[in-house]
Amino acid sequence: TPARLLYNLPVAWYLRALSSFEPVAHIDLSALAHNLGEVRRLVGSRVSVLAMVKADAYGHGAVAVTERLVSQGVDAFGVATLDEAERIATVRAGSTCVVFGGISPDEAARAVALDCDVVTDSRDVVGALAAGAVASGREARVHIKVDTGMHRLGLAPAEAVELARFAAATTGVSPVAVCSHFAM
């Protein structure tokens, strides 16, 4: 029987078969646009929309997804890294790009050059962003991250307030928001 034949195949055959399997995900960009329209209908036109396109839009193609969402009027895009921000830089058409994964002080000038908002919990990053902003004649925008239980990036609430005050008093830096990632 076919089942018996498969049962008797050597382990190497299974490993070869599994290693050649490449999952594929297809996205219907028209359905994406429709779904965005439904979200906008539910929340109203006064609510801004930030679309997360990190991890190559979760494997669906960040550039194509970003292009379609720009054409639908999405206000901002979220990515995890500056490399991801750079991949969508030419297609985001002036929309805000927020780097949620944090950056190191060494990456600050690049973040400013890419015109990205940065989520941070670091005074050193705020200082480096200020230096990059002043040197380039731009403004760096920061979102202060509060740790609410994920323990990846973020400050205790009192420390976040302190960092927000520091950012507000720093030339070249504009604190945009305080944010968190709620642990479930």
Per-segment meaning from a language model:
Residues L36-V47, R138:
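Glycine-rich phosphate/diphosphate-binding loops that line cofactor/substrate pockets in enzymes
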Residues S19, P23-H26, A31, V47-M184:
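Active-site-proximal beta-alpha core segment in soluble small-molecule metabolic enzymes
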Residues L5-L6, C179:
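Intrinsically disordered, low-complexity peptide-like regions
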Residues L6-Y7, H34, V53:
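Generic cytosolic/nucleocytoplasmic N-terminal low-complexity/intrinsically disordered segments
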Residues Y7-N8, Y14:
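Short, positively charged and aromatic/hydrophobic N-terminal segments
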Residues L9-P10, G37:
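Intrinsic disorder/low-complexity detector
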Residues T1-A3, A12:
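Ala/Thr-enriched low-complexity intrinsically disordered regions
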